[in-house]
Amino acid sequence: MKSTKNCVRIYRIKQDLTFVNILIVSNVNSEVKMIYNNVLDAIGTTPIIKLSRMVDEDSARILVKFEGLNVGGSIKTRTAFNMILEAEKQGKINKDTIIVEPTSGNQGIGLALVGAVRGYRTIIVMPDSVSEERRKLVKHYGAEVMLIHDAGNIGECIEECLQTALRMQRENPNVFVPQQFENPANLAVQKNVTGKEILEAVDGPIDGFCSGIGTGGTITGIGEALKEKNPDITIWAVEPEDAAILSGGSIGTHIQMGIGDGLIPPILNQNIYSDICIVKDEEALQTAKDLASKEGIMCGISSGTNVAAAIKLAKKLGKGKTVVTVLPDTAERYFSTPLFED
């Protein structure tokens, strides 16, 4: 007679943005499957990966949370969904609502995705300096794209995108602008979900964290979650050299898309970080390329920015410590950029 064994498995069931651990005792020969009601229920639980070939022996270990494997290909799907979810709960939007948002890319893709699933018409207002792939992805989800010319100052262009969206809201009562730069639902999901995922996954104390700043939601939300667990953690903000507004630098145009929008976001907690690391375009590009060729991780340019800073932080903290950062998106939306030039 063939014997069987019971095994214990923990399955994580998604309910909106909260996971519930369910303990299941099952026969090893049985098969348990999870079925999501829609793609939004599959958001999150992205892997944390230890970098093996890009870190010196005398440095802290570097762990990266790879959001390129998230639904929609970026970390911004989390924030897009939570902003819309909260707006629905508060009665701010209905079936006739038109979602309009100014963005340099990934938030727009996330909102287009959420709009497709929830049935909202979505219009994304973007600088014309963002990659062609980002525009096409927004359109592919069924949303509309409005382009604003970037004349060499990304801050001024983002401001014009915002004013365009707000003007549309004044002219049409059905228009809802999520306002990612000041929406508390943005940082809430990063603190309560993304930050929690990191804390649950990492085996031991987290000594350092660094992140580029777009809306400020990632560094504020995750940073606050990590700091509550370890008040002595070292947190660095990261800026592109050509948009180092926190450092008092001049504002131009750069290729580290998704961060360095030339403004200080209202939701950014400027007390959460102790230092600012400035990264040049060339350094961000090379680091992103190294992540592919040395670690097998296909990620975007701002991922290179974050890891370039993480390498510096890891050297400062030294062996035996742990540094965490985020890889915000996937490389496939950068084919037309210098990331894929020889």
Language-model segments: what does each one mean?
Residues S3, Q15:
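Cationic, low-complexity basic patches in intrinsically disordered or flexible, solvent-exposed regions
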Residues C7, Y11, V28-D342:
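PLP-dependent amino-acid enzyme catalytic core
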Residues R12, V20-N21:
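Generic low-polarity alpha-helical segments
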Residues I22-I24, V28:
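Intrinsic disorder/low-complexity segments in short proteins, especially the signal peptide
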